[in-house]
Amino acid sequence: MLFRSFHVGYTITTDKLDALYKQLKGKGVTMTALLAKAVAVTLARHPQVNASGSDTAMTYPERVNVAVAVAMEDGGLITPVLAEADRVDLYTLSRTWADLVSRARSKQLKPDEYSTGTFTLSNLGMFGVDRFDAILPPGTGAILAVAASRPTVVATKEGAITVRRQMQVNLTADHRVIYGTHAAAFLRDLAQLIENDPDSLAL
């Protein structure tokens, strides 16, 4: 039986996240780790988006394992897993990510280091793309595509015109498991975390 995936997009203001990254990158913190941590913390509040399904059953993992897409030099793709990313501190997460990427590119990862993700993150922001949709990997219920953060002219709630840095994120989800309201609520809460309280990610 074929299933239908669907897409939901959201625009997130990243000024506070970018400021936090500039503050912490000298300590080895990566933007990928920051994004993975933000996603994982939000997933812990939205277990439906961390779930997966088949034609006969749904699976609700006890852990939040964020798989992050990494391009290989031979043109392939692998998804190293940041296990329990909602519980691991940001600095350990950054060190773990650096180690996973290094071993992924030398093809030294163990199967459970790339096959146990419960949610996938694909970040093409470093390539400057405005937006993209990611293909849902087997075994997970959703994947989040993250585009570049750019200066954008916006209107404030008070009607003033200002410039803020914003990025577009797009969620691809399995409709057998996740409904549109689940996806929208997850993206809303992710945006609120990144926009209003990114410093909590470093605690």
Regions found by a protein language model. Give the residues of each.
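C-terminal catalytic/motor cores of large multi-domain enzyme assemblies
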Residues: 1-203
